Regions:
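The cytoplasmic-loop to transmembrane-helix boundary for the fourth helix
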Residues: 85-132
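Juxtamembrane loop-transmembrane helix junctions in multi-pass integral membrane proteins
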Residues: 2-6, 26-29, 33, 60-67, ...
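Structural signature of hydrophobic alpha-helical transmembrane segments
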Residues: 3-15, 66-75
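Extracellular-loop-to-transmembrane junctions of the mid-late helices
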Residues: 4-12, 114-158
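Internal transmembrane alpha-helix with an interfacial aromatic "cap," most often the third helix
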Residues: 19-27, 53-54, 60-61, 71-103
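Membrane-interfacial loop-to-transmembrane alpha-helix junctions, especially the N-terminal start
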Residues: 30-42, 95-101, 172-187
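Alpha-helical transmembrane segments in multipass membrane proteins, preferentially the mid-helix core
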Residues: 18-24, 79-86, 138-171
Length: 188
C-alpha cells in the first residue's frame, strides 16, 4: 500500500481519537446530550479511521472492511446529526431520538455482521461496497449518511438564520457560520 495513504490514515485516526476523548470529557463534565452524541460520532470516526489505517498497512480483508464500512458509512453521520439536533432542540426531542438511534445502530451492526459478501477482497485494492455487499448494507449506508447529512446542513442553515434575525453581535458569528457550512457539507 501507499506510504502516504497509510501515514494520513494513521494521523486521521489519532486526531479522531483525541477529538473523541475531548468530547467524551466534555460530556462527562457537563452531561449535555449533544456532547455525548458527538463523542459517539467521533469514536465511530476513530474506529473507521483505525480500520483504514490497518487496511492500508496490512491489506484489506472482509473483517476490516466491515468495521470500516459500519463505523464510517453506516453509523457515524447519524450520531453527528443527533448531536446537532440535541444542540438545536434540547433534550425533550434528542433523548427519545437517541434511544431510537441506539436501536437502529444495533440493528445496523447486526446486519453488517451477518451480511454475506459477494466476492473476495483484494488486499491492496480499496474495496467498494457495491462489489462486496448486497442491497441492505448499501441502503443502510445511504440512509445512515444521506439523511443525517441533510439534517446537519439544515441545522447549520437554521443556526445562521437565527443569528441573522437577532441582529446582535452574534451576527458576525453568522457570517463565520456561512463559511463553516460549506465545510460541513464537504465533510459529511
Amino acid at each position: 500500500m501507499n506510504q502516504l495513504t497509510t501515514s494520513l490514515a494513521a494521523f486521521a485516526s489519532l486526531v479522531a481519537l483525541v477529538f473523541a476523548l475531548v468530547t467524551a470529557d466534555r460530556w462527562h463534565r457537563r452531561r449535555l446530550t449533544h456532547h455525548s452524541a458527538w463523542a459517539m460520532a467521533m469514536s465511530l470516526f476513530a474506529v473507521g479511521s483505525f480500520a483504514l489505517w490497518w487496511a492500508t498497512a496490512t491489506g484489506w480483508s472482509n473483517g476490516v472492511f466491515r468495521v470500516f464500512f459500519t463505523a464510517g458509512a453506516v453509523l457515524n453521520v447519524a450520531w453527528l446529526a443527533l448531536g446537532s439536533i440535541a444542540l438545536l432542540t434540547g433534550d425533550r426531542i434528542a433523548l427519545p431520538l437517541r434511544r431510537i438511534l441506539a436501536l437502529l445502530s444495533a440493528f445496523a451492526v447486526g446486519v453488517m455482521v451477518v451480511a454475506p459478501t459477494t466476492k473476495p477482497f483484494i488486499a491492496d485494492e480499496f474495496p467498494r461496497a457495491r462489489d462486496h455487499f448486497g442491497a441492505l448494507p448499501r441502503v443502510l449506508a445511504a440512509i445512515g449518511s444521506g439523511v443525517p447529512a441533510l439534517i446537519i446542513i439544515l441545522g447549520a442553515l437554521w443556526s445562521i438564520a437565527r443569528l441573522i434575525a437577532r441582529r446582535t453581535p452574534a451576527f458576525a458569528g453568522a457570517r463565520r457560520q456561512g463559511v463553516v457550512t460549506p465545510k460541513r457539507l464537504v465533510a459529511s
